[in-house]
Regions:
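Terminal presequence/propeptide segments associated with secretion/organelle targeting
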Residues: 1-575
Length: 575
């Protein structure tokens, strides 16, 4: 049996190619594919082309299905066609055989504890810990790539594509094709957005976006069918396999077809997004032409030593399972654009994710050869913690990230400290001088000042002078109640101090315990014992032995490490 199909080879107009049916490939779960040989439009030389996914095939004058697969390094232009009956399941919400991505996500409390614990580790250990935390928020191994989509990439440097090659491949966007698809404007700039597109048509090129703005990332396939009500089906296979979804799509021009012995592909130039995908299932994708799907706005503020600040903006797909990865890729691009030499730098990172519970704000200052790795992995871990939280839909409204670079590795170490007096009365001020040593031995002195509360109890107290990470760990140990809501999780994140904070804390002994998501201090001995380890104690309860009395925080121009404890006595004046 012979028929014909439609696809775009250059420009925007679909062209006819010839189809010969070779047979039917039986498949599992009631799905079969039609095996075809194509010809015309130069397909004898190129073979079936990446970007032809969804190209409609007509047999006996009727729509039979869409080109959806081929084999690499084939000598004949042979491909597979997904029957249109299966594709229409994606419109109805059927497709009962769609297999969800396997993701071993942990509870939000466990993920938070792991992130907080990693915050104070040495750089190499911190990277290893963050990689473990980030793993559930990355595409799972073993997912079959959608091999006949043509990747679209603009503004993304090749170094970023290489770093995330494995992740992108699992999304069906192989990095070698992405590197070839980088916009002609070059890394760091996206092509100019052109005029509003015409309507989608069967056989026309279609691009679905994951990133759009100063950066572009997406995939180009072909529209299979458009109905009078504005609904359409495309691709003939899944894009990301995510079921119900909202992604922006646009009509697309084909600039050229790149012939390759492995797999030829289309070089595409998409128009501005105007429509939306609404379903992404095994037999294909579907959508509507009623409006454009919104994206999560991301704004980067780049500050480099000796240069003007720069702002970059783009949208990120609002799908929780890929949002963390796309945010991490965006951060990597911004770091490269701010300073393309990653070794021996100091990076100040501020990340704010707007949610229904308020903004999640995280700050840190990183220095040394692992600074870039830590910044990227922290972004994916925090993005996953928010987007994939177990409490409620975060309704992420936007992301703002500030990156400030300084040349060279810069850090302080706490060497020594001394107090103005070993005894202090309630209501008085306790002063301490802190000696700091730089990376090459240079020394500086800082002074911290704490006012002892008038209601402070008499007796022994401990002055702890420490870096931000150590202080964060101490705060969590003194108030270890796990988060029980999205708002509680946000407050926990805000308690993590950046590495460039030098903190003086005055602690006094206390009896307390955590219970029901709260930490109780100054308890009677019997109550503290019952709540911490008494009969029927639950795993969320733990004992608390100290409480904060006063605190002073200094912001330094570089990270600081180390801690010192000084015992003092709180004593009221005797009349």
């Amino acid at each position: 049996m012979k028929g014909w199909g439609l696809t775009v080879m250059k420009g925007a107009a679909p062209e006819r190619f010839e189809v010969e049916v070779l047979g039917v490939l039986p498949n599992t779960l009631g799905r079969s594919r039609i095996l075809v040989k194509v010809s015309g439009l130069g397909l004898e030389r190129t073979g079936v082309i990446a970007g032809m996914s969804g190209s409609p095939v007509y047999l006996d004058g009727k729509l039979a299905g869409a080109v959806s697969a081929t084999w690499a390094f084939g000598k004949d232009p042979v491909g597979q066609v997904t029957p249109i009956e299966n594709m229409l399941e994606s419109v109805s919400g059927g497709a009962p055989f769609s297999i969800p991505r396997a993701r071993a996500t942990s509870s939000s409390a466990a993920a938070w504890e792991a992130l907080a614990a990693a915050h104070g580790l040495p750089p190499d250990e911190r990277v290893a810990a963050l990689e473990r935390i980030a793993a559930p928020y990355r595409p799972a191994a073993g997912r079959e790539a959608a091999s006949l989509l043509a990747p679209v990439s603009a503004g993304i440097p090749s170094a970023t594509l290489s770093r995330f090659a494995e992740d992108l491949g699992r999304l069906g966007l192989p990095a070698p094709f992405l590197a070839s698809a980088v916009g002609a404007a070059g890394a760091g700039r996206a092509p100019e957005t052109r005029a509003a597109p015409d309507k989608l048509v069967a056989g026309g090129a279609l691009t679905a976006f994951l990133l759009d703005g100063d950066l572009q990332l997406g995939a180009t396939g072909t529209v299979t069918r458009v109905d009078p009500d504005g609904s359409f089906v495309a691709f003939g296979h899944p894009f990301l396999g995510m079921g119900e979804i909202e992604l922006p799509v646009a009509t697309t021009d084909v600039v050229e077809v790149f012939a390759s012995s492995m797999l030829s592909f289309k070089l595409a130039a998409p128009h501005a997004p105007a429509y939306r995908l609404t379903s992404d299932r095994d037999p294909g994708v579907s959508g509507r032409m009623d409006r454009v799907a919104p994206m999560i706005p991301v704004r980067f503020r780049l500050e480099a030593a000796g240069g003007p600040a720069k702002d970059l903006r783009w949208g990120v797909a609002p799908a929780p399972s890929i949002f963390p990865l796309l945010l991490a890729m965006s951060t990597d691009v911004a770091l490269l654009l701010n300073d393309p030499t990653p070794a021996q730098k100091t990076v100040a990172l501020r990340l704010s994710i707007g949610t229904a519970a308020g903004p999640f704000v995280y700050e840190d200052v990183l220095s040394g050869p692992r600074a870039r790795d830590i910044a990227i992995l922290t972004t994916i871990a925090l993005g996953g913690l928010v987007a994939d939280n177990e409490f409620e839909d975060p309704k992420i409204s936007g992301v703002e990230i500030t990156l400030a670079n300084a040349l060279g590795e810069r850090r302080f170490r706490v060497v020594d400290a001394g107090v103005s007096a070993r005894k202090v009365a309630p209501g008085q001020t306790l002063t301490a001088s802190v000696r700091l040593a730089g990376r090459r031995g240079e020394e500086e002195t800082r002074v911290v000042t704490l006012r002892v509360p008038r209601e402070a109890p008499e007796g022994r107290a401990t002055l702890v002078i420490a870096d931000g990470a150590a202080t964060s760990a101490a705060r969590l140990s003194l108030d270890p109640a796990p988060p029980r809501s999205l708002a509680g999780l946000r407050r926990m994140v805000e308690r993590l101090l950046p590495a460039n904070r030098l903190v003086a804390t005055l602690l006094v002994p206390a009896r307390g315990a955590t219970t029901g998501g709260a930490t109780l201090t100054a308890l009677p001995p019997s109550a503290a014992a019952i709540l911490s380890d008494g009969e029927g104690a639950d795993p969320g309860r733990s004992a608390v032995s100290s409480r904060f009395l006063a605190e002073d925080i200094l912001t330094l121009d570089r990270p600081v490490a180390g801690s010192i404890r000084i015992e003092v006595e709180i004593e009221r004046p005797r009349s």
